[in-house]
Curated annotation (Swiss-Prot):
Keywords: 4Fe-4S, Electron transport, Iron, Iron-sulfur, Metal-binding, Transport. This is Ferredoxin-like protein FixX. Could be part of an electron transfer system required for anaerobic carnitine reduction. Could be a 3Fe-4S cluster-containing protein. The keyword Amino-acid biosynthesis does not apply. The keyword Iron applies. PANTHER family: FERREDOXIN-LIKE (PTHR43082), FERREDOXIN-LIKE PROTEIN FIXX-RELATED (PTHR43082:SF1). Belongs to the bacterial-type ferredoxin family. FixX subfamily.
Length: 95
């Protein structure tokens, strides 16, 4: 019998080379609140976080580049979504 998969452990094995000079995802200045709620629930890496004051915090550094937020929020919540420049981004290690 196998043990349950711990997603946090699996994600922790991946390697991220973050491009600090050029974020590949940028939120709109005034994003649609409903769209942000969808992104909070849909992002598999959990990068959209609701704060105690109701604001949403986002950090592209742990992005899996799956495109979920691009599909769900490009016109409503995101100003820009593109893949990171060459040599940057996620390196999947399939821990």
């Amino acid at each position: 019998m196998t043990s349950p998969v711990n997603v946090d452990v699996k994600l922790g094995v991946n390697k991220f080379n973050v491009d600090e000079d050029s974020p590949h995802i940028i939120l709109k200045t005034d994003p649609d609140k409903q769209a942000l709620e969808v992104l909070i629930k849909a992002c598999p890496a959990g990068l959209y976080k609701k704060q105690d004051d109701g604001s949403v915090r986002f950090d592209y550094a742990g992005c899996l580049e799956c495109g979920t937020c691009r599909i769900l929020g490009l016109d409503t919540a995101l100003e820009k979504w593109e893949y990171p420049r060459g040599t940057f981004g996620v390196e999947f290690r399939y821990g």
